[in-house]
């Protein structure tokens, strides 16, 4: 098996980041959107409801960008090849979510966040730092991230207009899979993060949501 150095992995990381930071859809879509085949209901949504759905989906799109960057950063600094593989797998599985959200954003006639490059780079650095604390902490970081995303998606499902069935189908599928990712990390040996770290993570997520809602 070929050994990849830190610098090899860094080059791969930059190559994977470019489509995201240039706000282009990733090409590695492996599954159709859960909303595919559903009848659009945009015509029955008011202007305010369309704006609400678009803003919520933009937040979720940014959330997927951050998750992908976090896991890529952690994989870059992880010492165990097995953990690197798990983290890269988690990052890859977020690509579908990323594209589902972006497709829906365009259908709602709005835009992705103009700060995608900032969100990605910031999360990548956090992931790099988290990976230096060891493999079990990396898995704990993955599990906590997924649990927070799952709770966040539950709140958005409550806020979505009732008639926006396409966005709802996407978020419900994402919620199920984020929970599965968290449980997989826990079963692999993740250690719970200190409450203060959980609080900091939640505060950063709240800041991201507030900004991405508008830009």
Give names to the regions the model predicted.
Residues 1-215:
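Non-heme di-metal
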């Amino acid at each position: 098996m070929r050994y990849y150095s830190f610098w090899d992995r860094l080059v791969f990381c930059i190559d994977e980041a470019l489509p995201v930071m240039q706000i282009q859809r990733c090409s590695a879509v492996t599954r159709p959107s859960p909303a595919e085949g559903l009848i659009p209901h945009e015509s029955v949504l008011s202007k305010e409801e369309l704006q609400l759905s678009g803003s919520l989906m933009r937040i979720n799109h940014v959330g997927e960008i951050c998750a992908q960057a976090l896991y890529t950063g952690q994989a870059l600094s992880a010492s165990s090849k097995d953990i690197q593989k798990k983290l890269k797998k988690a990052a890859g599985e977020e690509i579908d979510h990323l594209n589902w959200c972006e497709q829906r954003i365009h259908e709602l006639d709005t835009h992705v966040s103009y700060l995608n490059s900032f969100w990605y780079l910031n999360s990548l650095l956090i992931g790099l730092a988290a990976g230096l604390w060891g493999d079990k902490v990396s898995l704990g970081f993955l599990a906590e991230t997924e649990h927070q995303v799952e709770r966040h998606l539950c709140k958005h499902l409550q806020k979505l207009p009732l008639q926006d069935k396409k966005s709802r189908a996407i978020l419900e599928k994402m919620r199920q899979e984020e929970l599965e990712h968290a449980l997989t990390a826990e079963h692999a040996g993740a250690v719970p993060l200190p409450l203060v770290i959980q609080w900091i993570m939640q505060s950063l997520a709240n800041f991201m949501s507030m900004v991405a809602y508008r830009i």
